[in-house]
Amino acid sequence: MTVPATTKDPRDSLLDSPLVHFPSLPRDSYLPHPTEHTVVSIDDEEILPSTRSSLHDVLQVAWSLVLADQTSSPEVVFGMAYDGRTTDDGEQAIMPFRLRLRAEDSVQEALAAAAAVTLQMRQWEHMGLRRFSTMSPQNVVLCQFRNLFVIDHKDPTEDCVERSCTSYSKGYALTVLCEIVDQVIHVHAMFDPLVLPPGQLRLILHQFGDILKTCLRGPPGRVKDLQQIGPDGLNYIYEWNRGGERDEGIVCVHQLIEDRFKQAPFAAAVCAWDGALTYGELDRWAKRIAAQLVEAGVKPGSFVGIYMQKSVLAVVAMVAIVKAGAAFIFLPPFLPTVRLQLMCQRTPVELVLSVATLLRSASDLSVPVQVLDYRAKDEEETAATSGGSEIAQPNHPLYAIFTSGSTGEPKGVVVDRASFGPGVREYCRRAQLGPNSRLFQSVSYAFIVSIFEQLISLALGACICVPSEEQLQNDMEGAMCRYQATWGCMTPSVARTLKPERLSCLKTLALTGEPVNQSDMEQWKDHVNLYTLYGQSETGSTLLINSITGSLADSRGLGRPSTGACWIVDPEDPTTLRPLGAEGELLIETTALARGYMNNLEESARTFIEMPKWLKQLRPQGHRSRCLLTGDIVRYYDTDGTIRLLSRKGTGAKIRGQRVELGEIEHHLRPKFPDARHILVDVVCPAKAGTGHSILVAFVHGPWKDTEKTGELATATSEFRQQARRVIAELRQVLPSFMVPSAIVPLADVPTTATGKVHRKSLRERMSALTVAEILAYNQEDRSAYRAPTTEQEALLLSICAELLYLPASSISLDNSFFQVGGDSLNARQLAAKVRSHGFSLLATDIFEASTLASLASRMRQYNQTDSEVSTAPEGDPFEGLKQELLGELPSSLVKENVEDVYPASDMQARAIRTHMLDYFPFEIKGQLDRHQLQHACETLIRRTPVMRSVFINFRGKMLQVTLRSVAIPYKELTIPTGEDPLSWARLHIAEDKKKTAAFDRPTIRFTLCRQSLQHHIFIVRLPHAIYDGSCLEQVAKQISAAYNAQTLPEAPDFAAYARRCARLRTPSAMDFWRNFLAESEVTRLPHASKGDEVAVIYPGECSPRSPPPGITMATAIKAAWAWVLHKRTGKLDVLFGQVGSTRGIDIPGATDIIGLCLNITAVRVQFAGLQTVEDLLRMLQQQHMRALMYETADWTDIVANASSWPEGTELDSVVLHENFGGLPALDLGDAIGEMADPIFSLSTSNPLTLVTWPSTQTLTSFLLTRENVFQKEYAEGLVTEFNQTLVQFLDFPESSLCSISTCG
């Protein structure tokens, strides 16, 4: 259902934006099992409104807001039920409830919108969910909600709520039942814990209760006020942050280090590749250098650079600078000179400490250089060695570090001495880092972690183990063992290169900088104490450390801060706290924060913000805490205050509206590529793909042999492509479709940042330069290289293929088939028609049979239109005799002079008439409309299009189509009552019109203009399905638009010419083909529960299959999957069913533009004996389709009567219909535009079962259409599930044997 609006209003149109269903399922085929139940109660006699309806609106808006926060989408959909309200069949009424919430709307507007949806829902709920879904394919999608919201007013004496909640919950991952008893609301939830963790659900229910109480106590002004945290949520957060107000006072790390010099002078301080020092030795050497620095003019507030590789001397230099009262900045030699120069200028650096071997490059920094000598270690102390640390103040800088800036230039962060010290002892206690620890210092000096670990180790008396760069690159494990390292900190990417069983000395490992996945935990959990570490350059000594005990949930938590408190605020408004469970930006409150950014007051003010008002009210006056906006998006995940990191602000990984855990995908990929050095997954926006179009891409860095490379990318070999396709197929079995990468790309090298992290942005940018086709080509079968056309036919064919497939002609090889370059059966028909329009003949069968485009071009011959033109002269008209017979016995409803043409209705037309198929297409028109001109356009359409003037007559047991010379133009105007939503009112008008029985012996086409204002109309076109199909809707819209704008379109072929051509194709050879095709066969029939009622029902499903193998169309794959389902369900090795196919491939010029019903049902037969693999089945069906193309216009009744041994009237039991035409057309009406809203269809149930499928960008929607009570509900749902699973398996593993295919339908 939709909120009152128009298609231009973002609240409207069932499919104007992708629905984000909540909760997301572990995989597409997962069936929820709601086994857990929980309840919370809201008890406040003063807040409940006096009327039920107003309370219902509040409940619905509150639940919508919760879902909006969970999905990060303003538009939500859920199932809605009022306990005890029933359908016409006496079942509990459940309907979809779709609502778009806008933060700036008033709450009253939101409540009114919910009330309007409820009113609209009341008008349809009598139908029930299944019948409602049959109104249009869009409704099928809408009805696939995953959570159900129930409102129930209970008598206080009743006590059956849990049973009631259980009865509702079947099939839904989450059911929330609001039981209202007197002045108490009991909120019950039944849920599947494998889909929705209990902790997350508890937060959801608390948030729901908070919103509800806030709204009921007196609705605040705007919706955004309801999206803030409520009183109960505040109490939780205050409790979690209890202790955050504690102030340790002035604690400076340099003082802690000085204490260690005095307390343990003989303890090991540094053990490096180039030497070792005790704390006493380190103290003495650093003092001498500090004295030299003071002599050179260094003072508190000065910055001194350290231009050295990892070494014992670098540690000494760092301590010496601190002792001199100055601040240090590491200048790693591997960074570009230009960047280092910029860092020196921005800081500014007064002096650089280096070594003799680096003197030449150090001189390029344009800063005075002082060379340190290892021999100075043993020199006698001279005089003043106390340095300047005694006069340095807490507000003097301790160090500076540069991070990546959003502008592309490095951003300098300055940390004061007072900002590094608070929380150090607490951090070490939690991280098990103490005087006996030996810390392996592997992290680059460009990474803030290197500063954290060195300063904290020295402050606690640990030993810093410093390997050489060569040891880190070539033998990291050996170095850790030689130094007997017990404590390490590194990124997960680095840790994955190590073997824990070889590191018996290592006791503690902290992972930082990147997400930790399940594989990381499994790798290390039995060998070390495993932690995650969170900190930023701006956080000083405020670090968050989290102990991982073995579950994935543990690894995603950030832990608690070593000092201060964590809050989650609105990313757009940091003065607002986010509700429990909602996403927001992490704000850290602490006394240990950086001073700010160098020479960037504006950026500092945005990041280091004043304490928000709500926080000031919690803290005593004069409290020293400051606040940092981290830029990280997080959320609470349980009622214990666990915070989970989701993404960086503005760069969250989302696909199809769903947040994607990239680490989880990487975890599943890692066992598939056991020799890979790195496995990465990221979201890529391909070139020329349009705004917002993104795909998932996996990157595998492995020991590829014999491959070329382009930058970081390696060339995909045939073996790699085959492996990648197999891996993607396997991932589909364990992950939801939106988490399966579209492509796997081999890497020759992994780009890294200056800090040693994987440079994901570099990879994204590299891939974003490629088109979708170029990215997908990494996993496709080999395509031939481009070969320029040499003939007129080849050039024309390439040009038409490029136009149809939206590909550059240079990317299409003449040595590939039409299907290898992206064509399908519909494109094939369009290709044949376009080739004919250019003066060449080409049959659709040629396209299917030709192995290459070159061979297809060779089949093109000059086309002589006169050879194929169908004459309508009496002597050549196969229907002239029929016309004369009808005129001799003309029904009273017709006038002889008004009869223009007569010919038999096709089987499809007759079915549409028998089942009263009338469809409605509402166009919402915005802008200045000339109503008279629109009426004239409708008259022109009728006049120019004979099929629009057709009626249908039963004559001597046959259905005839009679074209009239003139008809009264069925056009009328209505006025929409004031205050009514235009589209809602129009849909109700359509619903009333559908109740009337149409007489098809009179024109049934209707045009209705519903006027709300001069600028706003709804234009309804009613079409009997007997005179149109989906492929010609665009042509109908073009004809109306052209006539309105006084333009002339080329004459389109008349449907009568099509009918006559079909009649001429009914040849003896056609009947012979079908006779041989059906020999010794029988229609495959599924077990029916009953003949069923006339009411149509739909059982929906969805899957995400891969593209079929080259030369196979998706329609063929769908038929193969359905054939397999029939085989498995019936046990028959010879199955027969029907398919609905377009017959626009007929050899009439311009057949694609015919307005009329150009569809037919033909038979599909599969004999499984002799078929070994899935690909055997696919190839057999594709070849069968090609052979039948010449005879596809034969009517089923004709085939049964003249080409089978079956009784007259034998019908197919099941029929497959694969819809594959474009989007909804629009009307161009001068200054106004008419956009088609969701059509309302009448669905045919002439066959017991029709399987309907239609593709979208990344999914295939399917549904079974049948009559009510033909099948048991569980059986029908099992059929569609089994079909979807079979199709995915067939296309994931086309080379697999058929006997290995298993489904759980």
Curated annotation (Swiss-Prot):
Top EC class for this record: ligase
EC number: 6.3.2.-
Biotechnological relevance of this protein: Hancockiamide D displays potent cytotoxic activity against murine myeloma NS-1 cells, suggesting a potential antitumour application. More interestingly, hancockiamide C, the likely end metabolite of the hkm pathway, shows potent Arabidopsis thaliana seed anti-germination activity, but is inactive against the monocot Eragrostis tef seed, suggesting that it could be a herbicidal lead targeting monocots. The herbicidal activity of hancockiamide C could be due to its phenylpropanoid-like structural features, which may act on the plant lignan pathways, and hence warrants further investigations.
Recorded superkingdom: Eukaryota
UniProt keyword ATP-binding present: no
GO cellular component: cytoplasm
Domain Carrier: 788-864
One of the protein's GO biological processes: secondary metabolite biosynthetic process
Known catalytic reactions: hancockiamide D + (E)-cinnamate + ATP = hancockiamide A + AMP + diphosphate; hancockiamide H + (E)-cinnamate + ATP = hancockiamide G + AMP + diphosphate
Cited function: Nonribosomal peptide synthetase; part of the gene cluster that mediates the biosynthesis of hancockiamides, an unusual new family of N-cinnamoylated piperazines. The NRPS hkm10 and the NmrA-like reductase hkm9 are proposed to convert two molecules of L-Phe to the intermediary piperazine called xenocockiamide A. Xenocockiamide A is then converted to hancockiamide D via a series of hydroxylations and O-methylations.
Notes concerning its domains: NRP synthetases are composed of discrete domains (adenylation (A), thiolation (T) or peptidyl carrier protein (PCP) and condensation (C) domains) which when grouped together are referred to as a single module. Each module is responsible for the recognition (via the A domain) and incorporation of a single amino acid into the growing peptide product. Thus, an NRP synthetase is generally composed of one or more modules and can terminate in a thioesterase domain (TE) that releases the newly synthesized peptide from the enzyme.
Protein name, UniProt field: Nonribosomal peptide synthetase hkm11
Organism this protein belongs to: Aspergillus hancockii
